C-alpha cells in the first residue's frame, strides 16, 4: 500500500549494469543455495512451491514465515560491498557496483542520494539481493534448517511449534544483527501450512492422499479476477469509442 521508489537507469547505465550482471552471475551461481529460486536462471516460483511441499510432507509441518521489511530499500551498502569483496577482487567492478548503489533517484524533479538500499528497476538489483541473502541461506544451512527462498520471500519448515518459535527468534536476530536488515515482526509468524500464503499459493492437507498439496490462494485468485475485470472493462471502453 506504500510508495515504492524505482531507480530506472539510463540506456547507457542499463547497458553497463547488464554487462556487470553477465560477468557476476556465473560466478555467484556456483555459490548460491539450491533452495534459492528467485531471479535465477532456469528457476521459478513453481519449483519453490514443489520443494516446500516435499519438506512439509517429510514431517516439517510448522512454518516460520519471516517478512523482511522494505528489503530492497534497507540493504546496507557497506555490508553488501564487504560480502562482494570476498569473491570479487577486480577494483573496477567493485567501483562500478558501489557507484550503482549510490546513484540516487529523482523525486519531483529533485535528486536524492541513495544512502541505503539497492535501486529497484535496474538490471543488477535482483542479483545483488541474492548475493546479500545468500548469507542468510548459508546460516540456515549451517543450522540444518529446511527452507525455501524466493528473493526476499523466505519460509522455514520445522517439526514442532517449539522449534519454530526458537528458529523465528534466532534467525530474526541473525538477519538484524549480522545483515543489518529489518524483520517485520507484525507480518512474520509461526503457523501450520494451512495458514500460509506463499508466492500466491495456499496449502491444504489432502486426506485421501495423506499429504499436503498447493493451489492458488483465494486472495491471489480474487486479485487476478479483479484485474481481469478491470482490463476487460477498459477494452470494452475502447471498442465502444469506435462505434
Task: Report each predicted region and the residues it spans.
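Non-catalytic terminal/accessory segments
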Residues: 1-243
Amino acid at each position: 500500500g506504500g510508495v515504492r521508489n524505482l531507480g530506472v537507469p539510463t540506456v547507457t547505465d542499463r547497458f553497463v549494469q547488464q554487462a556487470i550482471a553477465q560477468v557476476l552471475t556465473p560466478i555467484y551461481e556456483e555459490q548460491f543455495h539450491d533452495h534459492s529460486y528467485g531471479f535465477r536462471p532456469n528457476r521459478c516460483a513453481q519449483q519453490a512451491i514443489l520443494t516446500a511441499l516435499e519438506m512439509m510432507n517429510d514431517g516439517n509441518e510448522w512454518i516460520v514465515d519471516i517478512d523482511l521489511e522494505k528489503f530492497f530499500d534497507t540493504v546496507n551498502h557497506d555490508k553488501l560491498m564487504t560480502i562482494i569483496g570476498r569473491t570479487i577482487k577486480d577494483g573496477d567492478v567493485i567501483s562500478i557496483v558501489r557507484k550503482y548503489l549510490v546513484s540516487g533517484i529523482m523525486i519531483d524533479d529533485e535528486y536524492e542520494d541513495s544512502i541505503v538500499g539497492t535501486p529497484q528497476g535496474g538490471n543488477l538489483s535482483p542479483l545483488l539481493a541474492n548475493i546479500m541473502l545468500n548469507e542468510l541461506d548459508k546460516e540456515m544451512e549451517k543450522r540444518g534448517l529446511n527452507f525455501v527462498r524466493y528473493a526476499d520471500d523466505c519460509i522455514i519448515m520445522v517439526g514442532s511449534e517449539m522449534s519454530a518459535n526458537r528458529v523465528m527468534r534466532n534467525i530474526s536476530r541473525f538477519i538484524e544483527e549480522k545483515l543489518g536488515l529489518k524483520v517485520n515482526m507484525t507480518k512474520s509468524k509461526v503457523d501450520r501450512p494451512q495458514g500460509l500464503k506463499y508466492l500466491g499459493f495456499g496449502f491444504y492437507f489432502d486426506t485421501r492422499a495423506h499429504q499436503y498439496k498447493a493451489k492458488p490462494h483465494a486472495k491471489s485468485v480474487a486479485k487476478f479476477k479483479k484485474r481481469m475485470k478491470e482490463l476487460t472493462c477498459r477494452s470494452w471502453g475502447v471498442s465502444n469509442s469506435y462505434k
